[in-house]
């Protein structure tokens, strides 16, 4: 369902940061200021948000992978829930340097986590001493927290979706180095440079974060559903050409 400007207003998307913290590169997206707080121009935000969703929808239809990134307290739960709903990988704890640029190292950690999960499933921890089981449990919990959201990501993602580019500067830099497109929410205190699909908006309010993230997840789900429908329709069309009615009375 399309998001309206009223919904953006109700979610507080238009509230930027204090004017003294502004980044001049965001000037084209600022409507003005009130009580020393910059007000973001939603007439600019809405079409740019829709462009970002269109890209996410097309990428998903082509079986692309979008990595969701949001590690701030107010976005962690939303990022995990919406990414899982869309069947996409996510990072909602600390971003580990090299997650993209040194993916080989990440793969080693992912293998370790999967091996530990298999060991737990097989009941191997029951044969461990209390101390060994405790150490195993601690290591596994640490791995789940840091890389659990990307354990099924088979390779480098086709794009990343980021909430707060300043807080996730390393993730954006790594994506830029590898030429991975970046969809991101950019508030008035950060630069839109290096972002392929800019969504000018509040990156702190939980309602605003939920709105952006649910929108991207919806676009992905819709894109995949459209792709499946096209395949089904194409298959039906092919079968229709070959269909021959048989008269049983003949």
Swiss-Prot record:
It comes from the Bacteria. One of its GO terms (molecular function) is structural constituent of ribosome. The keyword Phosphoprotein does not apply. Keywords: Ribonucleoprotein, Ribosomal protein. One of its GO terms (cellular component) is cytosolic small ribosomal subunit. Coiled coil: none annotated. InterPro entries: Ribosomal_uS2, Ribosomal_uS2_bac/mit/plastid, Ribosomal_uS2_CS, Ribosomal_uS2_flav_dom_sf. GO terms for biological process: translation. SUPFAM superfamilies: Ribosomal protein S2. Belongs to the universal ribosomal protein uS2 family. PANTHER family: 30S RIBOSOMAL PROTEIN S2 PROKARYOTIC AND ORGANELLAR, SMALL RIBOSOMAL SUBUNIT PROTEIN US2M. HAMAP family: Ribosomal_uS2_B. This is Small ribosomal subunit protein uS2.
